């Protein structure tokens, strides 16, 4: 009886790895790996090329029954309404959006303290962000990078139709449709909340229902 094979794809900061495994036993059957470019920003097309190379090294995926993709967090891939990449992806290790992170916290903390809230406006802003989306903005987060684009590249910001993480983009390319993301990933990037009573943190981008690609 033919065994069932599944594949795992890890599109990390440094490389793409493809692992083909026996679904029943967990035995490693084949493996491939290809490097990604160094740096804090990258053209997503390199991720696709690396995936193709790694998949070829792993003997191809034609006999695989299922495939899952995971990878680096906190990157920003912005797409237009045709699904085209607007600019190089800003990775988690790009900290140029630190001023935007601070500004987002300051803005949400500006209103007077309510019952039980800290008197310090920065602490208050962080607390309100956590209440709204589960985390407080830092320079590595996707949201702050979007705010950076809005402030520094307004023409690119106007083109944004969807925002996704690096492995979301690769999942879309592999599946042939999308873009997609997990709710948990969007939540970690301060892009999503499942709370109907949460305050609406304002950024320099208009609020829209597809802020996180779905």
Where are these regions (language model features)?
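N-terminal glycine/serine-rich phosphate-binding loop of ATP-dependent small-molecule kinases
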Residues: 1-88, 99, 131, 159
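Gly/Ser/Thr-rich active-site cleft segment
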Residues: 11-13, 115, 129-214
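Structural signal for hydrophobic packing residues in well-ordered secondary-structure cores
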Residues: 24, 55, 59-62, 105-112, ...
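Generic beta-strand or strand-like secondary-structure segments
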Residues: 50-53, 100-103, 148, 169
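Carbohydrate-associated surface elements
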Residues: 94
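Pocket-flanking alpha-helical
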Residues: 99-104, 122-125
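Glycine-rich phosphate-binding segment of PLP-dependent enzymes
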Residues: 102-109, 210-214
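Intrinsically disordered, low-complexity terminal tails and inter-domain linkers enriched
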Residues: 109-124
């Amino acid at each position: 009886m033919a065994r069932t094979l599944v594949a795992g794809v890890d599109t990390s900061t440094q490389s793409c790895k493809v692992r083909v495994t026996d679904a029943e036993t967990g035995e490693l059957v084949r493996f491939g790996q290809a490097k990604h470019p160094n740096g804090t920003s990258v053209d997503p097309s390199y991720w696709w090329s690396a995936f193709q190379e790694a998949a070829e090294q792993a003997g191809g995926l034609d006999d695989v029954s299922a495939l899952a993709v995971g990878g680096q967090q906190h990157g920003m891939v912005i797409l237009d309404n045709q699904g085209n990449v607007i600019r190089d992806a800003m990775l988690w290790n790009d900290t140029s959006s630190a001023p935007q992170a601070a500004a987002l916290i300051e803005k949400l903390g500006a209103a007077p303290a309510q019952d039980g809230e800290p008197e310090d406006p920065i602490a208050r802003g962080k607390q309100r962000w956590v209440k709204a989306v589960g985390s407080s903005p830092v320079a590595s987060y996707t949201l702050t990078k979007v705010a950076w684009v809005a402030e520094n590249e307004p023409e690119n910001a106007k083109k944004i139709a969807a925002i996704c993480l690096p492995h979301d983009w690769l999942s879309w390319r592999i599946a042939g449709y999308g873009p997609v993301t997990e709710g948990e990933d969007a939540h970690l990037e301060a892009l999503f909340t499942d709370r109907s009573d949460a305050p609406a943190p304002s950024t320099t981008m208009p609020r829209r229902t597809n802020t996180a690609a779905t």
